[in-house]
């Protein structure tokens, strides 16, 4: 009977399903999930708040204090308006779509075409606050049973991103894995209105430009192509970045023509040029088999046009290696 009484009054569902964000997020988006979560917060009842007072003997020489307990009455239920939440979510995406259409007619990424054609450099990612860190994600071999750990936080004075952790090449004791030891930092895929996948267009630039400070370890810089084919999800273009250690910043310039093609971590004999007009993400991977702590501090990541670099592709192609290019 007590369970039936709770079901009729609605308190059972409010207690068991206090945070519906995990269930509603895939269907209604982030904004609706945050809105519905805020509705489940307990609200203080000023007319029914209980108080506790000290006795007169304990109040000698002290000021009288009153402690209010925020207790939500079982009769009061949060007013959940799903129609309003769905309407607000739809209006947000439509406003976002309107801005995208206006920017498209104005020019690439909302800039006039003549300014884009004359643009020689552009900062794509910089780290000046927590919202910049939210555009990235970190991962390690801990997901497959390894012992490596990696963390990402803001650097000193909130002017850089600090990637740090501990690398361990000890293989997981699962009876299958024989190698381990990697940590990575990957940018999130940009999203447009209605959670559509977006991409970066770097076709007018020829060099990747970074300002970093490390501990002397070599890193792998990985760039992924935007694709809808499941077979290409493990394909990427990579090159090495060597940090020299010490307290000073270093500027790293890597031409896009140097990036080599790999699939599932293996360099392929058949090499392809990096498609700069549809870049989905960039990442940094550490896997040098040197166990111990590490760190990499990043100021910004950008692209620019180097007039002195005229190379289009650094790797040889021949009819034996890549017969499709010579048909």
Swiss-Prot record:
Compartment(s): Mitochondrion; Mitochondrion matrix
Domain of life: Eukaryota
Modified residues (Phosphoserine): 318
Region (Disordered): 42-63
Gene3D superfamilies: Galactose-binding lectin
GO function terms (MF aspect): unfolded protein binding
Protein name stated in the entry: Complex I intermediate-associated protein 30, mitochondrial
Organism for this UniProt entry: Pan troglodytes (Chimpanzee)
Lineage of producing organism: Eukaryota, Metazoa, Chordata, Craniata, Vertebrata
């Amino acid at each position: 009977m007590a369970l039936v009484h709770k079901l009729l009054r609605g308190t059972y569902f409010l207690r068991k399903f206090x945070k519906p964000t995990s269930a509603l997020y895939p269907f209604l988006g982030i904004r609706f999930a945050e809105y519905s979560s805020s509705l489940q917060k307990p609200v203080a009842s000023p007319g029914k708040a209980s108080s506790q007072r000290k006795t007169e003997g304990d109040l000698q020489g002290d000021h009288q204090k009153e402690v209010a307990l925020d207790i939500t009455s079982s009769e009061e239920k949060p007013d959940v308006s799903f129609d309003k939440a769905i309407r607000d979510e739809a209006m947000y995406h439509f406003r976002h779509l309107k801005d995208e259409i206006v920017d498209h007619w104005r020019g690439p990424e909302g800039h006039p075409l003549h300014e884009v054609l004359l643009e020689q450099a552009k900062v794509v990612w910089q780290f000046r606050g927590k919202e910049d860190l939210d555009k990235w994600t970190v991962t390690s071999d801990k997901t497959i049973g390894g012992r490596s750990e990696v963390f990402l936080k803001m650097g000193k004075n909130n002017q850089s991103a600090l990637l740090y952790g501990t690398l361990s090449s000890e293989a997981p004791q699962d009876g299958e894995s024989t190698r381990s030891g990697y940590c990575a930092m990957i940018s999130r895929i940009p999203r447009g209105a209605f959670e559509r996948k977006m991409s970066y267009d770097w076709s007018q630039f020829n060099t990747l430009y970074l300002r970093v400070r490390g501990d002397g370890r070599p890193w792998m810089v990985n760039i992924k192509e935007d694709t809808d084919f499941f077979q290409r999800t493990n394909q990427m273009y990579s090159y090495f970045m060597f940090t020299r250690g010490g307290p000073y910043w270093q500027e790293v310039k890597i031409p896009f023509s140097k990036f080599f093609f790999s699939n599932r971590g293996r360099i392929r004999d058949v090499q392809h040029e990096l498609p700069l007009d549809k870049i989905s993400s960039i990442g940094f991977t550490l896997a040098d088999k040197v166990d111990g702590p590490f760190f990499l501090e990043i100021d910004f990541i950008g692209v620019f046009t180097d007039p002195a670099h005229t190379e289009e592709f650094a790797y040889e192609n021949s009819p034996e290696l890549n017969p499709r290019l010579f048909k």
